[in-house]
């Protein structure tokens, strides 16, 4: 399961995810309670993402410090990260460092929250998409017309 999707969906769950999976694994029907509204997940990445280039990773990203201007929100999920001498740093080679999630009653509110949370993150050479959720107005109309949403 793509970790961006699972981190984003987990943010919308009221039911603890551990309990949900325990019930599922035990053959019980899990009681899934979720928040109303929308969730958006945005990947914070560094070079070489989206490419596989060990030399670029070694030169620009390996062991780069991950700093938060203020204590991070609960909805920041780590990916290729490790602790080195008490400091969170970039690890792995995928270039995917964090998944930041925003929630809101509307798509615009979820967008505002996720991008506000991203402003709290400082990683050398980091980048991320700034258009997540922008097409929701058109996409939701299509999904309604196709009968997928009611």
What are these regions (language model features)?
Residues 1-150:
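ATP-dependent carboxylate activation and anion-phosphoryl transfer catalytic cores
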